Structure formats: structure tokens, C-alpha cells
């Protein structure tokens, strides 16, 4: 090398070094800022808490560092000659015995014995840093950056001289890797030195958990990835630990010397022409920006790598512009480029030859290797237009290979694939020849495959398009032939053919992976023009393809229309032929009619002879029908086969897999019966269509069969059933009408009727029956019976197949006491809707009300031929009918039959259990409940029934009951679990186990939803009140008031007022009820409680006043009228009768009012009237228990103490009453059955009732001041006339709360 060349080379290198140094400083400042942001975010997530103090200290030190940059630049040369000792900042863990400092990393290896002696010092509460150490840190960073810059300069020059210009991107990456691996080499060569790391991120990464680590000094050993050196410096997983021995200055000098030696060795290797193996990680230093911290990659790595690439590209451009070569290896690179160009030319020639061969094979195998739809399958996504125009521009436009066949193309596919340029040329050749396919998605064996759309150029003529249309028609014909053949193939054969075609075409069409070169980034203007022309051609080709697709769709539609017309003509011809045959058969049967009195054998022979004669006389006619049927069957089979093949090919494997489990599910019993019924009807019609032989008999059954077979007109019922379906538009119109009609109702009946009649002209006919139904209801509420009947008749005439009209009409007649007319209406409705469950149940109950059990059983007998799965609800009503009639054995058989055939319906087991419980057969009831729980373990009511039964049969031993609670908790859903614990708490309360009851309430609170917690607090308050813990009960009521919804607040206020009354605070109770009158004005129970409060306090005048004020607001509350009747007994019988008559005008169906009328009749010794009134009371309100007790008293007065009350017990069992003052007085326990309460009432009546004669003798006028009856009769004076304060606590609670049991 000459002196001038060496001088120019050294001068250029100095200039480049200065520029690189300037750029590197700017980059370092940016990188440091970004690193600081990253460390702040990372440490906030890692440590949290008091990290802001550390961050402020770092910012302050950074400002000092920027001020000292100029001074440091001047001292760089001195630092290179005499480097200072740089020490990485560390966390200091001060041990009491020995000074052990851990730089950063994992603390899992510290011994447990050392934990107590380790003090973690981290800035304030978190960590601590020395300012001197931070200054050393900044100096250390600058020192290593300068070394890296020098290393970059040398390596860039050498690598640019050695490598080709086409591989600039690789060289940039190699330089980065060289620099990255240099540090690793330095660190690996020095076994006894500590790793001095840049601790911007790592200095705060300290694991919070400390596990066993043993330390030793003076020997090299590894324990759990812990290395200990001879110089006293140990490392844990690559992290240095200083044990206090050794000099850091000497180690740094050694490191610097070793780094300089490595640099010299790398330069010597480059000068010798050796290639650097980038796979070796020990060559160059690994920069901090690309490190991973605790598995998290640094965010600055991408920024630094981009900046380095830009700098290296600028250097290379400058080096290219220099006239003199930098290294003697430049000429060798030119030779290598020439050799590469020659090799590329040879490859292109070989590829052109392969293209010609492939095109010939492609044309020959297009018809063979097409899919079922005639479309080639290619296992890749479609290439974008940019990729077709210039495939070497960007890899983002390249087609993506299919993931389904990734195992086939996973290796080096250079031999199996062709170049992208050849692929583009092949597409152009295909467009010029016109051999293209439409782009479509076709489902192959392994998934969706794309077939490319290679369209002809814009220069194609109309003749060419016509030829293409003809080719497509030919292909369709070939497809039809192929599909007919493919039907008879097995699924495996079809799969094999599809996969073979796919594998063949994928090797031809699939492009290889694209390798980008740097020359492709620079495009000539000529190439750009070519790209624009190609894009324009592609757009025109797309438009042309759309036009062709539209033409093909129009042709397909025309063909389908022609096929439909032909099918219709064939069907018409068949119908005409059938009609002619039927007419001929009828004429011949009329001739043979006199021979009808012969035996059945002769009649069959005659029919056979007639059929033979008909077949002989018309052989051609029969053959024609058979041929037509055969052709129809063949066409139908072909269509079905084509559809099956298309669906199998178009559906993806995932969809087929999702459909397979649905097909494998067994059909339900209802579906099986429907399938059998449809199969039978289809078989009958197919046989008649194929044979055209109708065996005609003159019986009525055969005539009905002929009407169904000959497709005669449907009966009028069927024509009107089609009108039941209402469109969404008609429903929306009806909703709009109802809103306006409700507003017109308030103005009056006439205005509403006028509006309704006007709306009939606008509304559709399908909705007219609903309008008439609303008008009938309005007339009924206005007590216009005649008008209501007219409208109901209009409803039943327009839509007789809707049960709602019949039910409303029958209910109106029943309300007016016309039971016979109601019966006729229900019978007429069942003729039109014979198997409607609501009509059947209503009819059965009405027949039972009329004491016509035979009529009810006759209605049930109609269901004999019907499926149990459609009529099981009506059958269950029949079982309840027999149970109410006292036929217990028949009812048990019916329920047993239902439990066998409908085991999945829980209410069947519930009704069967109630039947056995009413009969006091508790063991049978338990067996039924357990059987039901086995079939449906998540049905909650059965679990509550089981708890009730086990508590009844426990006799104080609750082990089985508690086991049932645990079973129920595991079986039911979480929404019901809190109710199980609530019931368990009440069970424990009744057995006097308050601790267990409170524990169960606590569990109920834990599992109860927030909107229902008030019920648990209310139940707990009632429990504490029964235990006379009034303070705790009051607190729980307050808690319930806080959480109860506003709509149910009145219930909690009632509980609060009763609690204060029980505690003796009557005035406070009155104030609470007054507040409840304002908040819950619509709740009549609040007003009734005010009346009862005054009655219990013996303030009868105030009670009468409260009752009259309450009736002004709630005139429809029967219990308020009953209380007013009781209070007017003090004023005499006449006043009582006047109130009774007035009450019947407002509440004619109130059982409480009729019961008070019966008491008035009993006091006046009018026993017949009393019995009649009590029957009304039981009929209208069967839940009111006082009616049954008064009826029992009437029976004892008439028939004596030894009277038979079995019918009364059965009546009481069927009604199952649950409230009433006298009823609750006779109830000993909540678990008592209706029969047990009635027996208790009889005992009390016999003990307290005097004989009838004495009763009549002692009846005096002054007894009118009594409540009901004399003192010796069980009457209300036991409840009210006694002083409330003199009662026991149990009697007070019974009088206060009555039947209001808190239920979950």
C-alpha cells in the first residue's frame, strides 16, 4: 500500500470516527432517557411504594452528568491511557458477621440461618445509593461506548471490503452480533472476574423471598448454580457476589487487557480472510440494549438496532464513493459476483425449460385433477395484485401457505417449488391462452383451499368469451357425470382422489419463500410504469370476470325454471291419470254393488278379479305409470346425491365435526312417535302412488280413508287453523290498538266500543277475535251480561280453535252461577280443541264441582289413544281428581304410572308426596321423595319436602334431618343453597337448639343474594323474639329495614310494629303503622293491622273508625269487611246484617265475609242458612280455616259429639287451609296437618261446648254483647275479649303473628 493511500485511508478513518462519535453520543443520551423511563415503570410495578424518591435522585444525578459531558470528552484520551476503576452500583446486604454485598439477582439461595442477620438497605424505606457509585456508573457507560465505537469502525471497514453489496443487511446484523458477542467472550474467558453489568434495570430487581445459599471463600465450587472464585468474588446464576477479599482495581485492569487482546485477535482474523461464525455467542460483547431482565426483553433493543443500521448504511455509501479500494480483497469480491451471475443465468434457463414442461402437463391434467366443483385446489391464500406485478418488492404481499399441510412443506422446499418470477410468468401465459379458473373457496379433505383467478387480458374478443361459455357448459356436463359416478364410491376413495389432486397441483403452483435482496429496493421508472399497466389490466380483468359470472347465474336460473316447469307438468299429468282411474273404479264398483251381501271371502275374490281384469285391459297404462315413477325416483335420487356431495365438499371439517355429535344424539320419545306416525303416512301415500290400486269398500271407515288418499278438500276446521298464525306486523298493530283502547276505557264504555269498531276496519282479520275478546271483558266488568255474551259468541265463531275464548266465556257463566251453561260451553270447546290441556283441566274441575265424577272420567277416557307425552298434565289432574274424591288407591296407581313414564318432571313427585302426607303415610311419602330426588336431584321443592318429612318423623332426633341438609347443600344450585340453611335454622329453632340455629343463619347470610338478605334478618329477628331477646330482634329488624326493597318495605314495618306491641310499646307501634300508611298506601294488610291493634287493646270505637277509613281506600279487601262485621256485633244483629249485606255488594266472593254471615246465622239459630253460607265460604276461599271450624261446630250441634266427620276431614284435606284466628288457635305446631288441626278443634269444642238444650236455654239478649255464641262455645272471645296483657307470651305471639311465618 502506498504512502498516499495510507494517508488518505487514515484521514478518512479519523473523519468517520469523529462523525460516529458525535452520533453515538446523541444516541446514548436518547437511549439513557428511554432506559430511565423503562426502569421507573418496571420498578414501580416491581416494588411500588416509595420509588419516587429514587427516581428524583436519578434525575438530579442525570442533570449533573449532562453538565460534565464536555469535561469528560476532553479527558477521554487520558481515560484510555489510564482507565479509572469503575464499580457497578449494588444493593448492600449488611451482614453482622461478614460484609456480604449482592449486586443484583436471585436471593433464593441465601441460607435460612442468615435471614435474621441480613439488613436490606434500599433508598429510604426501599433502597440506598451512593452518589460516588452513580458517578462511577456514568463513567463506566462512557468507557464501554467508546470501545464499542472503535470496534464498530474497524469491523465496518473490514466487513465492507470483504462482503458483497447485495448482503448489506446481513453485514449490519453481523456487526451488531459481533459487538454483542464480544462481551460474552470477555466474560467467559475470565473465570475469576465478576460480571460488571449496567444496572439501570437490574439494580432494583431483588426477589422478595430468600432461600438457602451457602457461601465459601478461597475455592472454586458450584452449589445450586452458585460459583465461588479464588479471589473472593462469587456469582449466583451469573450475578457477582463480593465476599470482601480481592481488589476490584486489579480485576478491572485485567478485564481491559483481555478485551484489547480479543480485539487484536478479531482484527487478525479479518485480515486473514476468515469468516466470522455468528452462531458462536462468545465472539463479541453483548450490548445492554438487547438484554433480557428476568425474562422481560428490553424495549430499547429495536431502537438501538435501527439507529445502528442507519449509521452503517451511511458509512457504506461513503465507502462506495471512494475511488481507491479499502482492502486487497475487493478484487476477489468482483470475481465472486461474476460467478454468481453466471449461476443465476443457468438457473433461469433451467427454470424456463421446467415451465414449458409443466404447462403441457397442466393442460393435460386439468380435467383429471379438478375437484368436484371443477376448481383446482391450491393450499395457499390468494396472492395480492402487488405481488403478481412484482413479487420481489415486499414479503408482505406474498401468498401464505396453508397451515393444514405445514408438515409437507416444512423443510427446504427449493426443489419442490418454483420461483415467484416464474409463477408470475405462468399466470400471464395462462391468461393469454384463456385457461383460467374462477376464484372460489372449495372445501377439501383438510379444510378450505383457494383456487386463483387467472383472468384473460382486455384484448380478448367476443368470440373468445363465447368459446369460454361453451367450455364452461361442457365442464358442467362433465361434472354431472362425475358426480353420478362418485356417488357409488366410498368416502375413502373420494378422499384419496382429492388429496392426490391437491398434492400434485400444490407442487406445481405453490411459490417458494421469497429472499429479499437489497437491489430490489431500488426500482427503475420503467418498472413502475409496468406495474401501473399491470394494475390497470387486472382491474379490467376483474370487471370482465364479474360480467361472465352474471351471465352464468342468469343461465342457471333459466335452467332451474325450466326444470321446475317440467316437474309441474309431470305432476299434473299424474293427477289427471289418477282421477281417471278413480272414476273408472267407482263406475265398476257401482256395477258390483248388489253383490255386497255375499261373504267377505267372495268380496275379496271379486276385488282381486277386478284388479287383474283392469291390469290386463290397460297394460300400457300401468307400464307408463311405473316408468314415470321410476324416472321420478331416479331424478330424486340424483338430486339428493348431488346435494350430499356438494354439502360434503363445501362444509369444513370443523363444521362436520360439530354436526356429528348432534346427529348422534338419540331422539326423544316424542320425536320417535312423530317419526313413526310420519313414516306410516308416507308409506301409505307412496304405495298408493306407485300401484294406483284402491281397494274400495262401502263401509264408512273406508270412505274416510278414500278422502285422505284422494287428497280431497280439507274440513272446515283445517282451513281455519291456518289463520291462527299471526304475522309480526299484525301483532305490532294489535299492541298499538291495546294501548289506545286502555285509555279509552277510562272515558267510558261507549267511547271505547266506538273506538274498537273503528279500529276493526284498519286491523287485519287475524286480530279481530282479540278485539272482540277485549270488548267482552269490558262489558263483563260493566255488568252488561247480554252484551258480553254477544261478544264472546263472536269470538268463538271467528276463531273456534283457540281455547282462550271458550275459557273466558265459561268463566263468566260460572261467576254468575250458571253452571250448566258453563258445562255446555266447555263441552263445545272440547269438540273444536279435543286435546287442549287447559280446556281439559277446566272441564274436569267443573264436572267435579257439579258432583259429576262420571262426566269428568268420561273426559279423561278420550285420552286413551293419545300419547302420554302429550297428555300427562291432564292425566295428573285425573289423579288429583280421584284423590279429592277419596279414591286413594286409584290415585296412587295413576301417579305410579306417571312417575314411570314421565320421570323427568318433578311436580309429579311433589303431588304424589302431598297425597301420602295428607293420608299420614309418611314412609311412603319419604320413598316417593327419595325417588324423585334420584331422578332430578336439583329440584328444590322436593328437598324442602324431604326436610319437612324427616323433621316430622324424627321425634326429637335430628340426625337424619341434618344429613338431608348436607345432601341438599351439595345437590342444589348456589341460588337455592341459602334457603336450605334458612330451613335448617328454623328446624333447629323448633328443637330449641339456638346455637345451631344462629350458625345456620350465618351460613345463609354468606350465601344469600344481596336483594334477599332482608328475609334472613327478618327470620333471625323472629327467632330472637321467640327466645325473648327483644334487643337483638330489634337490631335485626333495623338491618332488614336498611336492605329491604322499597316495594316490600311494608312487610318489615309490620314486623317492627308487632315487635313493639309485644314489648308493650303500643304508642310506638301506632306511629310505625301510621308511617306505613303513607309509604305503603296500596297494601291493605297495613290498614288491617291498625284495626287489629285497636281490637287487641280493647279500643273498639277506634277500631271501627280505623276500619271505615281503611275501606274508603281498599273497598275490595274482604278481611277488612269481616273485621267491621265483627266489631258491629257490639251494636246488635241488625247493624251486623246491614254491614254484611253491604259487604256482599263489594266482595261477593270473599270467604271471610260469608263465614261472618254464617256466625250471625248460628247466633240466631238459623242452621240451614249457616250451612249454606259456610259452603259458599269454603267454595270461594278454601284457605280460610275458620270456615271449617264453624262447619265442625255446626255438625256437633246438629248430630252430637259422636258425629261422623270423615267427609269434613276429606274436604279440609283437599282445601289445605293456612290462616284464620280460630284455626291458628287450634294449631299446636307448624308441622301439623289439616286433619290434625281439625281433630284439635273438635277436642276444644267438646270440652267447652254445652249441650244443645242448655245452649238454647242460656241464650239471652245480653249475649249479643258477646263476640260469637255463648261463653261455652269455641269462639273469638278466646282471642279478643280477654285482656291481651294477661295472656302468656306464647298466646301473645300466636295472636300477633298468626299464620305469618317467615319463609325463604
From Swiss-Prot:
TPR repeats (start-end): 769-802, 899-932, 978-1011, 1046-1079, 1084-1111, 1112-1150, 1152-1184
Chain spans, region Disordered: 19-85, 153-195, 296-334, 447-477, 576-687, 706-728
Domain of life from the UniProt record: Eukaryota
InterPro entries according to UniProt: HAT, Syf1-like, TPR-like_helical_dom_sf, TPR_rpt
Bias (Low complexity) ranges: 25-44, 52-85, 153-194, 307-316, 466-477, 576-597, 626-687
One record GO biological process: mRNA splicing, via spliceosome
Listed Polar residues bias regions: 296-306, 448-465
Key words, A-Z: Repeat, TPR repeat
Biased composition (Basic residues): 598-625
Name of this chain's protein: TPR-containing protein DDB_G0280363
Organism of this sequence: Dictyostelium discoideum (Social amoeba)
Lineage, broadest ranks: Eukaryota, Amoebozoa, Evosea, Eumycetozoa, Dictyostelia
